[in-house]
Amino acid sequence: MTILVLFLSCAALASAECCSRGDAEVVISEWDQVFNAAMAGSSESAVGVAIFDAFFASSGVSPSMFPGGGDSNNPEFLAQVSRVVSGADIAINSLTNRATCDSLLSHLNAQHRAISGVTGAAVTHLSQAISSVVAQVLPSAHIDAWEYCMAYIAAGIGAGL
């Protein structure tokens, strides 16, 4: 019974307790394979555009809310994709150092508070899109670890939005 209560609490919260150090290490390793490995036909912008495509499909957020309107041939949109993917890279790679990660997430939260129209729900959808694309690129991805750790990141960035 105690294990069930603990499991349900963890699943409901998807918080720091759920993105354990082991989860974080798995996510960092798998992100490295997706983000940094030289995979044939894949690049940072291709992965980033796939993340945004998944985000637009699941969130209901209009591509027009972003520079370049979601056009994968538009340099303004590709610059936005690069900023988001780079931010995700830094956040993911800081997961094993919670003080650094929390400071970064607080900084990203402040940046997003200054942008009209950004919501916590949209941040959550984007984090889920990242997990979804990782699972597509890396079929052996540990999706539970991704869900826990991306929920932690989304909660930090999206707090109060």
From Swiss-Prot:
GO terms for molecular function: heme binding; iron ion binding; oxygen binding; oxygen carrier activity. It is found in: Secreted. Keywords: Disulfide bond, Heme, Iron, Metal-binding, Oxygen transport, Secreted, Signal, Transport. CDD domains: Mb-like. One of its GO terms (cellular component) is extracellular region. Gene3D superfamilies: Globins. It comes from the Eukaryota. Residues 1-16 form the signal peptide. The keyword Transport applies. The keyword Transcription regulation does not apply. Pfam families: Globin. Heme b binds at H112. InterPro entries: Globin, Globin-like_sf, Globin/Proto, Haemoglobin_extracell, Mb-like_M. The extracellular giant hemoglobin is able to bind and transport oxygen and sulfide simultaneously and reversibly at two different sites. This is Extracellular giant hemoglobin major globin subunit B1. It comes from Oligobrachia mashikoi. The lineage of its organism: Eukaryota, Metazoa, Spiralia, Lophotrochozoa, Annelida. The gene is ghbB1.
